[in-house]
Amino acid sequence: MPLLDSFKVDHTKMPAPAVRLAKTMQTPKGDTISVFDLRFTRPNCELLSEKGIHTMEHLIAGFMREHLNNTRVEIIDISPMGCRTGFYMSVVGAPNEYNVKEAWESSMRDVLRICDEKDIPELNIYQCGTAKMHSLKEAQDIAQVVLDKGVSVMNTQELLLKDFA
């Protein structure tokens, strides 16, 4: 089985919150696909609560699109990591990490402005596979920590494990 790119970086050196351009690739028609690591917590030190990360998934999907999408960049997907330390975001285009950082911080401010769980998008049994597993408070706590700490930018080359450098 091939080793995935995400396992070629030293997770013990990852700061958080931080954004990292994990990889870029070209489609057969020449479009650029960029994959970003949005690391909310330090790996193996802390993890996001299951209700908090689930609610954040619903909120960040729309907010990041509002702040990052433009004529040259379109978010394909933002998915939580199985380790519950962050999200992977795939986009058509090549935004730089600083644009992603600004969009992420703006999105966290948007999360803090949500007043009621009824305002969480797709929070119903028809559009969500676990509609009871949400917490606006926990998502807002996550957003506040991101804003309090500030988002930094990681360099993938500096994080490569020596066998892959």
Curated annotation (Swiss-Prot):
Query: Enzyme group, top EC level?
Result: lyase
Q: What is the superkingdom listed in this entry's lineage?
A: Bacteria
EC number(s) given by UniProt: 4.4.1.21
Which SUPFAM superfamilies does this UniProt record tie to the protein?
Answer: LuxS/MPP-like metallohydrolase
- Chain sites annotated for binding Fe cation: 54, 58, 128
Tell me if Protein biosynthesis is a UniProt keyword of this record: no
- Tell whether Disulfide bond is among the UniProt keywords: no
Q: Which GO terms describe its molecular function?
A: iron ion binding; S-ribosylhomocysteine lyase activity
Q: Name one GO biological process term.
A: quorum sensing
Q: What binding details are noted for the cofactor?
A: Binds 1 Fe cation per subunit.
- Required co-factors: Fe cation
Kindly give the HAMAP family that the UniProt entry links to this protein. Answer: LuxS
Give the family, as the similarity comment puts it: Belongs to the LuxS family.
Subunit-structure text: Homodimer.
The record describes the protein's role as: Involved in the synthesis of autoinducer 2 (AI-2) which is secreted by bacteria and is used to communicate both the cell density and the metabolic potential of the environment. The regulation of gene expression in response to changes in cell density is called quorum sensing. Catalyzes the transformation of S-ribosylhomocysteine (RHC) to homocysteine (HC) and 4,5-dihydroxy-2,3-pentadione (DPD).
Name listed for the protein in its UniProt record = S-ribosylhomocysteine lyase
Q: Which organism is it from?
A: Helicobacter hepaticus (strain ATCC 51449 / 3B1)
